[in-house]
């Protein structure tokens, strides 16, 4: 199952692990070493010539004692967000995931009502699911932790692995049934479809305004420039919800909707 997962099949570790500021999450062995040394992603200086993917040894203490204890997770300690001092994710076994699935940066502050966007990647970086669960890291709007953070024991692990410890890490519908009895899909009461429609509307407005561009390969880039704060926030929040978090509200439906609703107001 692991081989079919994105962690198991992606070659991103080859592309990114050679950079010291990327190796924590993109090199499985660097992650293990960094966790053992109690280093956060921004403190890592390890660069391996032969990087490894996020394999068994990245998450588990394989071949340490040669006993059943080797299946123990590398860490389940609560995670302090290095880009957001004072913010902590404490989601049980899901804490392991949050070490990497956290924002690397925050939206730029406005100066005289304008935000200077200087990067084509104006977003929190890939995989900030833990901050979405907490209801934070959006531009111009803070939220609250979702029920999927506060009520689901072991957060990420419960929903993405289920009782069978599914190592594809694809969300397991069976994990939802304790609260959402008899559902047959993740789009409960059409909530995800409604949010998707608003995300699509916002995307069209951002393209029309020239704040993002279509790269023609299924990806989009931010267009650098000096923008009114509300529009820059809209650019950030669209990317955060639609491109980086990717759950279409499943991680925090209330916060995701609030971010997109506020963004749409920037384009009357």
Question: Model-found features: residue ranges?
Answer:
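Divalent metal-coordination and catalytic microenvironments
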Residues: 2, 96, 179, 263
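Generic recognition of stable, solvent-exposed alpha-helical segments in well-folded globular domains
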Residues: 20, 54, 91-95, 151-154, ...
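Sequence context of c-type cytochrome heme-c attachment sites
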Residues: 1-92, 99-169
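Long, well-ordered mid-to-C-terminal structural blocks that present hydrophobic/aromatic surfaces
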Residues: 162, 168-185
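Mature extracytoplasmic or organellar-lumen-exposed domains after removal of signal/transit peptides
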Residues: 184-192, 196-268
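Detector for Asparagine
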Residues: 27, 50, 95, 99, ...
């Amino acid at each position: 199952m692991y081989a079919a997962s994105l962690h198991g099949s992606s070659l991103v570790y080859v592309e990114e692990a050679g950079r010291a500021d990327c190796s924590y999450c993109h090199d499985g062995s660097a992650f293990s070493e960094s966790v053992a040394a109690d280093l956060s992603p921004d403190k890592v200086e390890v660069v391996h010539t032969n990087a490894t993917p996020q394999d068994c040894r990245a998450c588990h203490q394989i071949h340490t004692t040669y006993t059943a204890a080797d299946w123990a997770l590398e860490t389940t300690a609560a995670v302090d967000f290095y880009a957001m001092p004072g913010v902590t994710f404490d989601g049980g076994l899901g804490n392991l995931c949050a070490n990497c699935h956290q924002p690397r940066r925050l939206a730029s502050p406005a100066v005289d009502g304008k935000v200077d966007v200087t990067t084509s990647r104006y977003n929190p970086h890939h995989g900030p699911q833990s901050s979405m669960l907490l209801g934070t890291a959006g531009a111009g709007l803070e939220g609250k932790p979702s029920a999927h953070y506060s009520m689901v024991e072991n957060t990420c692990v419960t929903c993405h692995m289920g009782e069978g410890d599914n190592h594809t890490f694809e969300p397991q519908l069976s994990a939802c049934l304790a609260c959402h009895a008899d559902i047959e899909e993740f789009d409960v009461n059409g909530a995800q479809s409604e949010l998707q429609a608003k995300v699509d509307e916002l995307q069209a407005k951002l393209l029309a305004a020239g704040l993002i561009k279509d790269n023609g390969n299924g990806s989009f880039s931010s267009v650098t420039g000096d923008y009114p704060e509300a529009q820059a926030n809209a650019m950030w929040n669209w990317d955060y919800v639609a491109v980086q978090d990717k759950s279409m509200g499943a991680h925090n439906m209330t916060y995701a909707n609030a971010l997109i609703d506020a963004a749409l107001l920037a384009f009357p």
